[in-house]
Amino acid sequence: MLCPAWLLAVAVVGVVRGVKGQCWENPRCHDLSSENNLLECIQLCRSDLTTKSPIFPVKVHLQPPSPSDSDSPPLYLPLSLLSPSSPLYPTEQQNSVSPQAKRSYSMEHFRWGKPVGRKRRPVKVYTNGVEEESSEAFPSEMRRELGTDDAVYPSLEAGTAEGGEAEGMEGVFSLQEKKDGSYKMNHFRWSGPPASKRYGGFMKSWDERSQKPLLTLFKNVIIKDGQQKREQWGREEGEEKRALGERKYHFQG
């Protein structure tokens, strides 16, 4: 009696073959009562598949591997040996490694990949109820307590009790305005220079500009003109006196 695995192998070969020109039409595959006839039929179907396999007009390394390769198991073996647990595929089980078992990539060559030294230890913040858990790990002076001191941080309720409800609301609105407004870089010296120093002082209006240089210019021009006029008047007076002296000398002679 034939094993069901052999019959299943023959059925798989017949299904892969297609509708037209099946290998079952061969007289060797009509009588499957013996094991020899069954093996001959399987070999015939295999040879028919290899001869009629499509040939791709591409390079050799891009073509699909033929079923006659050494790495593919023979078709006449039982299907129980084709399972992944069979010893025919030992390398695939060794090469298949779960992604969880792979080591994570640590970017140690970047300065933010792995902190060095004491930077690895996170800063722990303790409340009043959790201080007893790690009292031995950290000394008392290194702990940061999150205490709520009413003297340092007055609550809004105290302000409302004293009639300062408007002040509390103004503080809330001021915070909201800071969030909604544009960010001003006041801590940089180029954020908002005074108007007198913007663009070297050339973009100021006429009223904003200092008028001292203009007044000094007018004053210098007036003084210079006055000096020139006085010199001219002095020369004219000298010429007149000289002319009068010549006339007196002429009349006396």
Curated annotation (Swiss-Prot):
Name one cellular component (GO) term: extracellular region
InterPro entries associated with the record: Mcrtin_ACTH_cent (IPR013531), Melanocortin_N (IPR013593), Opioid_neuropept (IPR013532), PMOC (IPR001941), POMC-derived_peptides (IPR050878)
Name its cellular compartments: Secreted
SS bonds (residue pairs): 23-45, 29-41
Residues recorded with modification Pyrrolidone carboxylic acid: 22
Q: Please verify whether the record's keywords include Oxidoreductase.
A: no
Processing after translation: Specific enzymatic cleavages at paired basic residues yield the different active peptides.
Q: Positions modified as N-acetylserine?
A: 104
Residues with the modification Glutamine amide, per the entry, are: 252
> Which keywords has UniProt assigned to this entry?
Acetylation, Amidation, Cleavage on pair of basic residues, Disulfide bond, Endorphin, Hormone, Pyrrolidone carboxylic acid, Secreted, Signal
Q: Which GO terms describe its molecular function?
A: neuropeptide hormone activity
Its tissue distribution reads: C-terminal peptide 1 and C-terminal peptide 2 are detected in the anterior part of the nucleus lateralis tuberis of hypothalamus, in dorsal hypothalamus, thalamus, telencephalon, optic tectum and medulla oblongata (at protein level). Expressed in pituitary and hypothalamus of adult diploid animals, and hypothalamus of triploid and ovulated female trout.
Q: Which residues carry this modification: Valine amide?
A: 116
Instruction: Tell me the first and last residues of the signal peptide.
Output: 1-21
Region Disordered, annotated ranges: 228-253
Specify the superkingdom: Eukaryota
Q: Which GO terms describe its biological process?
A: neuropeptide signaling pathway
SMART domains annotated for this entry? ACTH_domain (SM01363), NPP (SM01364), Op_neuropeptide (SM01365)
Job description of the protein = Melanocyte-stimulating hormone alpha: Anorexigenic peptide. Increases the pigmentation of skin by increasing melanin production in melanocytes. Melanocyte-stimulating hormone beta: Increases the pigmentation of skin by increasing melanin production in melanocytes.
Family, per entry: Belongs to the POMC family.
- Protein name (record): Pro-opiomelanocortin A
Source organism (scientific name): Oncorhynchus mykiss (Rainbow trout)
